[in-house]
């Protein structure tokens, strides 16, 4: 094997087995990763990118998966032939991995510092005091604030970004030659995501280790990787240095991944999807400034559908067991109006108060003070019966549709259940007919009616969540991080669907997200929140083009732009 190649994968094929059927997941892929290089594997869910990384780590699920052919050379070892005992010395020591969800990788009952100490105890001969000093140094290296406090904290006591930094500290503790980062920023705010990418770059430059970075977002990896491999249905369809892949993509799938993220410079009527590119049917119609101005003249000549007036939400928290309650304002004096047929974007980092405000509008969590008017009536003072009637009019699409769907109900019954509660349709037969029509409108086949939530992909489940929401014929829909857990390509499909449904049914959206690029694409008005207050409020394009506040500038700067 050539010296400069740290990792060389040759004609690797992997199959999974179930109920006597072999399913080929990885189909003869080959690539090399050099020393001191960052290579990204990009593709949507199910493309095989994570399975490839698990094979390199020797972590393929036993009994149901098998490497059917090929080799994985790491330095002078073919990892396909290495036994489990030898792999224990390589894994964590020479090859380390950061996972997508740090909460499921960290032990919830063990302090963060102790978890990193465990790695060092397993792979080094340092004394206990030396190990503690090393962990504090690692926490400083990954730029954790107050390293000693984090050392003593449990995972649930720190933020998502801090948990991911603890995971990175664990991964680099033994100074590995290769770091595999599997979607390490997917669940994080754009600003935290940028910080984590900058941190990985800094560590790589300092330690000269190689990084295999796995993501579904091509724009994101362009800011980090030297080389890109594009995976589609278990095959590498394109590979090369990052700038050539970006500036001159050859495969339609690569072109689709680049185009699926909303552009900062213009607004397409429809976001291009992978199926559009694969069938060469990309709609490049742009919504002009004039179209937008004319739409807004009509929109804002109406009476507002919703008025939020000086709303506050205060929580009481204790700083210690015997201490007094300390008030914390999650929403602090917020006022704005929403007009029929409008999409207002609510954007800000985690903890800024945007979801709390959404819940207050939905009356799921009552505001401490202030007025919320829907069609001119204050909904904060409604009785139980009136509130129930309001629920039909104001609905929500959740971030995680799987958590909001009953796993024991078929999709059809899950959608029909709230229809029955709110007297939509006169009979079961009428309701079923309507549900089948709605499933068709959200791009699902009629057979979905009889299937269960676990049988669907993330994007399909989000479509089911949308179907359940629109079945009640609401007027105002709160979309709370409705696309943040989806692949960029699937996200484009769902955003197109939301816009199509809006033009068909005249819905009004409050679109909550931490991703300013997505919100800017969807929104007429943009409301930027920070620490419970409104930072900026105005036309989405105007705020994006010339933000006034530093906080807004920071959010815009953090959006992956691509090359």
Mark where each language-model region is.
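ABC ATPase "signature
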Residues: 239-240, 248, 534-538, 546
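Conserved signature/switch motifs of ABC ATPase nucleotide-binding domains
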Residues: 92, 156, 174, 454, ...
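Conserved ABC transporter NBD signature motif
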Residues: 66-78, 370-378, 390
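Conserved ABC ATPase signature
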Residues: 153-158, 162, 452-456, 460
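A short, proline-enriched helix->beta-strand linker immediately N-terminal to the Walker B motif
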Residues: 173-177, 471-475, 491
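Conserved ABC ATPase "signature" region
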Residues: 130-149, 429-447, 556-557
């Amino acid at each position: 094997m050539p010296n400069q190649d740290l990792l060389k994968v040759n004609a690797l094929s992997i199959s999974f087995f179930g109920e006597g059927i072999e399913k080929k997941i990885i189909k003869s892929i080959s690539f090399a990763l050099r020393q001191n290089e960052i290579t990204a594997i990009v593709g949507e869910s199910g493309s095989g990118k994570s399975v490839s990384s698990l094979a390199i780590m020797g972590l393929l699920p036993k009994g149901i998966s098998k490497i059917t052919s090929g080799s994985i050379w790491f330095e002078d070892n073919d990892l396909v032939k290495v036994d489990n005992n030898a792999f224990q010395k390589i894994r964590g020591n020479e090859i380390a991995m950061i996972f997508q969800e740090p909460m499921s990788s960290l032990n919830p009952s063990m302090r963060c510092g102790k978890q990193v100490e465990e790695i060092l105890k397993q792979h080094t001969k340092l004394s206990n005091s030396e190990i503690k000093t090393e962990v504090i140094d690692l926490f400083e290296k990954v730029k954790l604030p107050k390293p000693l406090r984090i050392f003593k904290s449990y995972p649930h006591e720190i933020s998502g970004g801090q948990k991911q930094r603890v995971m990175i500290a664990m991964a680099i503790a033994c100074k590995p030659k290769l770091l595999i980062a599997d979607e390490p920023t997917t669940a994080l705010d754009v600003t935290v995501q940028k910080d984590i990418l900058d941190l990985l770059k800094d560590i790589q430059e300092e330690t000269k280790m190689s990084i295999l970075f796995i993501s579904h977002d091509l724009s994101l990896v362009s800011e980090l990787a030297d080389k890109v491999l594009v995976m589609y249905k278990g095959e590498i369809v394109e590979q090369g240095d990052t700038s050539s892949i970006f500036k001159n993509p050859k495969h339609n799938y690569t072109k689709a991944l680049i185009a699926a993220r909303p552009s900062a410079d213009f607004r397409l009527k429809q976001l291009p999807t992978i199926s559009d590119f694969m069938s060469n049917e990309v709609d490049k119609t742009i919504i002009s400034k004039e179209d937008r101005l004319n739409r807004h003249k009509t929109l804002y000549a109406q009476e507002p559908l919703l008025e939020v007036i000086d709303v506050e939400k205060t929580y009481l928290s204790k700083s210690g067991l015997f201490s007094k309650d300390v008030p914390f304002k999650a929403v602090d004096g917020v006022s704005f109006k929403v007009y029929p047929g409008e999409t207002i974007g609510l954007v800000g980092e985690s903890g800024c108060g945007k979801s709390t405000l959404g819940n207050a509008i939905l009356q799921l969590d009552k505001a401490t003070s202030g007025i919320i008017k829907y069609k001119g009536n204050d909904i904060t003072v409604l009785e139980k019966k009136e509130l129930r009637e309001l629920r039909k009019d104001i609905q929500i699409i959740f971030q995680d549709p799987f958590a909001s769907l009953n796993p024991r109900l078929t999709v059809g019954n899950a959608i029909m259940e709230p229809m029955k509660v709110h007297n939509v349709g006169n009979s079961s037969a009428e309701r079923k007919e309507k549900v089948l029509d709605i499933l068709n409108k959200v791009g699902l086949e009629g057979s979905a009616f009889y299937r269960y939530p676990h049988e669907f992909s993330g994007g399909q489940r989000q479509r089911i969540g949308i179907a359940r929401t629109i079945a009640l014929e609401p007027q105002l829909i709160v979309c709370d991080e409705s696309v943040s857990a989806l692949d960029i390509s699937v996200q484009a499909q769902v955003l197109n669907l939301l816009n199509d449904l809006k033009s068909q049914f005249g819905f009004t959206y409050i679109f909550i997200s931490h991703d300013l690029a997505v919100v800017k694409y969807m929104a007429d008005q943009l409301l930027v929140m920070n620490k419970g207050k409104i930072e900026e409020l105005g036309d989405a394009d105007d705020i994006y083009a010339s933000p006034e506040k530093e906080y807004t500038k920071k959010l815009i700067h953090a959006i992956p732009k691509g090359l």
